[in-house]
Amino acid sequence: MSKNTISLSIYDGSEGMEYIVHKNGDVNITTIHNGGIESEVDVDVECFGFETPEGLIADLIDQGFEIQWPV
């Protein structure tokens, strides 16, 4: 993952979601169902009502998403 992106995820067993938020405002969303990828979509932070990536990131953290730090 590049230094211009941040990954946030939330999982409950084999269900969950991952958001990869890019500095330029692009967002990749992956939905996990029964341990496998169910859907993937690419959108912009403005689709969520935010003008900047930081606003979306703060909202996701408030919802319980966790930042996935590089290993």
PLM regions: where:
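Short intrinsically disordered terminal tails
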Residues: 1-4, 66-71
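A short beta-strand micro-motif
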Residues: 4-12
